């Protein structure tokens, strides 16, 4: 066998090819002289490139030779060497001009942009969000990061390495990308392959001996084989025996489990700002210090959106500052993540809400986990409660003996939306952990949108029509009076029972109780659409309210007065929801709203209409009494007065509405068409 015979070439004529080709230790073929007709170095049939040492040949293996462009027919039409193969995403012919137009994957994209390569579909997948990218282009990567998670561009190399290791652990791979199956049968084969690769690398590291000492390469290889047969094989047998004995199987599984938990913890910290507690198998928010009920992404998303949505806009440096501040407080972390001894919640039970006990007096609170200087430096300040809530929290903490003690556990404040304050005039009551209506002073038991809408529909439906400036003025006066009452030191009820206020008296009560509650509620129901209607509320009711609040120690301020509005239109009769009922239908179509059936009732014939639609009204009039369209304004006024009198006789005592003013002619008879309907 001639020197260098272990290398195959496809130039015609046989092995080695014609011409004075100079060979080296491992069968390398050096470039021939200009006079020779040899061929350029080419790949073998398996698509593997020649192994070239850069120390002896310089940059010949990375750039094409100038003479290679002028080759004859022996070059088989090849114009370029495989200079891109070292960077290709797969071995062989990748990114060869004229043959394969697909792009190739760069290894530095993994740590720089956190993009992993999937050989099965020749594409990339994002290690941050798990999305698949369509093309292997840098512009695609940057556009994806800019649209999905721009904050990841500001992560430090250490944080990116954490994400990469977490991704490998998620796929069951090692830190270097090798399959990690500890305690499995395939581990021995993988180690054998690694040893063979290591041996090949050592063989390539042998220095070239020149053209006349080609057999030295074979001697070097035989020497390596002898070393391998003497030391590697016994070590492999010992490793196989120990693994068959099962000694390292449990240890490897535990080590893999520990690495998975650590990588999961680092991923939650960098991506979700959540600290993972492996002992309790739960998450703790690094922004507010609260424990989450489970590890589901839905719970994480709901917690962030309800408690501190502003944390979603944090930039990379801000997140890094928050992570550093959280990592600098190990005492607070251990106090927070350690379950309380009297906690009856099993740590692995992820279906129930976590019940965290309050920290001790000397332990830092959850709000102190992110120091103020770090948050100010990051430019992010969490939402602060209103003045009334701060005063309430301070008052409660002083009564318990712990100043500014945060409430932990099932805190319903996380469900409170700040927009409810101006949109529905609802304030959070920190004492009862419920809502307080700033219109009537009523207390709502639950922090639910359905409860708010039902309360407004039943008590004061007219408050929905208040303008924005009027609602802002009401909220401002409420906050001022609440702060004034707290400054006076008025006692607050400790029990969660709702105190009976003059404005929250039930409409179903008999006698004078309902009559006392109705004028105030109807006054709010009469509130006009525009700011400026005159206040028709008598001063006697205000005096009665002030007198009734002092002995009872009411925790909420009295009802504020809006600015004087213009004269209001005729109010609707019922306190039920009438968002689709138009008051003008009363005089224009002689249609009244029936609160018991939530529909319309005709004042002419007493018929009931199913839907609150103008088309239904017109169809009813055309089919039943089309002559009513020709009524004069005087006739319509007469029908309205007769209907008011009939309604007063039928259900004036049931709280349907305040008694209508007496008609001009008290002795007027009812019209035949006026029928009283409940």
Curated annotation (Swiss-Prot):
Biased composition (Basic and acidic residues): 79-88, 573-583
A Pfam family of this chain: zf-C2H2_12
Cross-link for Glycyl lysine isopeptide (Lys-Gly) (interchain with G-Cter in SUMO2), residue positions: 375
InterPro entries (alphabetical): SPIN-DOC_Znf-C2H2, Znf_C2H2_type, ZnF_transloc-Spindlin_int
Start-end of Low complexity biased regions: 66-78, 205-214, 493-509
Signal peptide, first to last residue: none
Any Gene Ontology CC annotation: nucleus
Feature: compositional bias, Acidic residues: 187-200, 512-524, 539-549
Bias type Pro residues, positions: 557-572
Assigned keywords, A-Z: Isopeptide bond, Ubl conjugation
Stretches for region Disordered: 1-100, 174-250, 333-413, 493-583
Protein's name in the database: Zinc finger translocation-associated protein
The species this protein was found in: Mus musculus (Mouse)
Gene designation per UniProt: Zfta
């Amino acid at each position: 066998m001639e020197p260098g015979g272990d290398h195959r070439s496809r130039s015609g004529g046989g092995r080695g090819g014609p011409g004075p080709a100079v060979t080296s230790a491992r069968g390398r073929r050096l470039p021939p002289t200009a006079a020779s007709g040899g061929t350029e170095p080419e790949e073998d049939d398996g698509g593997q490139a020649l192994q070239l040492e850069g120390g002896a040949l310089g940059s010949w293996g990375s750039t094409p030779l100038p003479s290679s462009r002028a080759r004859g027919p022996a070059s088989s039409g090849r114009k370029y060497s495989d200079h891109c193969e070292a960077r290709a995403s797969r071995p062989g012919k990748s990114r060869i001009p004229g043959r394969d137009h697909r792009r190739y994957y760069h290894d530095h994209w993994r740590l720089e942009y956190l993009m992993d390569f999937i050989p099965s579909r020749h594409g990339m997948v994002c290690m941050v969000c798990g999305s698949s990218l369509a093309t292997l282009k840098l512009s695609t990567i940057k556009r994806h990061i800019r649209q999905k998670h721009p904050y990841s561009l500001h992560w430090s190399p250490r944080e990116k390495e954490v994400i990469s290791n977490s991704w490998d652990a998620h796929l069951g791979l090692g830190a270097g990308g090798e399959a990690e199956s500890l305690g499995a049968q395939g581990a021995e084969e993988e180690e054998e392959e690694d040893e063979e690769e290591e041996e090949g690398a050592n063989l390539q590291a042998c220095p070239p001996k020149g053209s006349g000492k080609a057999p030295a390469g074979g001697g070097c290889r035989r020497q390596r084989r002898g070393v391998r047969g003497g030391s590697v094989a016994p070590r492999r047998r010992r490793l196989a025996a120990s693994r068959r004995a099962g000694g390292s199987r449990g240890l490897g599984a535990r080590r893999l489990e520990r690495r998975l938990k650590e990588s999961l913890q680092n991923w939650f910290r960098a991506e979700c700002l959540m600290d993972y507690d492996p002992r309790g198998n739960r998450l703790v928010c690094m922004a507010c210090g609260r424990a989450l009920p489970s590890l589901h992404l839905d719970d994480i998303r709901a917690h962030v959106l309800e408690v501190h949505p502003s944390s979603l806009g944090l930039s990379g440096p801000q997140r890094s500052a928050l992570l550093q501040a959280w990592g600098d407080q190990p005492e607070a972390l251990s106090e927070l993540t350690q379950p309380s001894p009297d906690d009856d919640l099993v740590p692995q039970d992820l279906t129930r809400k976590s019940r965290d006990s309050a920290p001790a007096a000397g332990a830092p609170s959850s709000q102190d986990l992110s120091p103020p200087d770090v948050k100010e430096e990051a430019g992010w300040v969490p939402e602060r409660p209103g003045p009334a809530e701060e005063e309430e929290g301070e008052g409660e903490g002083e009564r318990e003996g712990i100043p500014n003690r945060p409430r932990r556990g099932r805190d319903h404040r996380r469900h409170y939306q700040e927009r409810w304050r101006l949109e529905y005039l609802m304030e959070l009551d920190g004492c009862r952990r419920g809502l307080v209506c700033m219109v009537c002073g009523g207390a709502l038991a639950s922090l639910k949108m359905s409860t708010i809408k039902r309360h407004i529909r039943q008590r004061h439906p007219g408050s929905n029509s208040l303008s924005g400036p009027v609602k802002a003025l009401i909220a401002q006066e409420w906050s001022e009076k609440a702060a004034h009452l707290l400054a006076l030191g008025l006692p607050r009820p400790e029990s969660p029972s709702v105190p009976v206020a003059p404005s929250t008296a039930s409409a179903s009560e008999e006698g004078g109780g309902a009559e006392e509650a109705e004028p105030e509620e109807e006054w709010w129901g009469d509130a006009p659409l525009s700011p400026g209607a005159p206040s028709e509320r008598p001063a006697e009711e205000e005096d009665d309210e002030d007198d009734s609040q002092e002995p009872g120690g009411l925790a909420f301020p009295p009802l504020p007065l809006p600015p004087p509005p213009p004269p209001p239109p005729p109010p609707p009769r019922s306190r039920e929801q009438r968002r689709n009922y138009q008051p003008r239908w009363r005089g224009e179509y002689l249609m009244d709203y029936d609160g018991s059936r939530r529909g319309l009732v005709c004042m002419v014939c007493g018929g009931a209409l199913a839907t609150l639609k103008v088309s239904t009204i017109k169809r009813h009039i055309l089919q039943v009494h089309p002559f009513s369209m020709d009524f004069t304004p005087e006739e319509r006024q007469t029908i309205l007065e007769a209907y008011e009198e009939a309604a007063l006789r039928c259900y004036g005592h049931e709280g349907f509405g305040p008694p209508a003013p007496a008609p001009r002619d008290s002795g007027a008879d009812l019209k035949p068409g006026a029928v009283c309907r409940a």
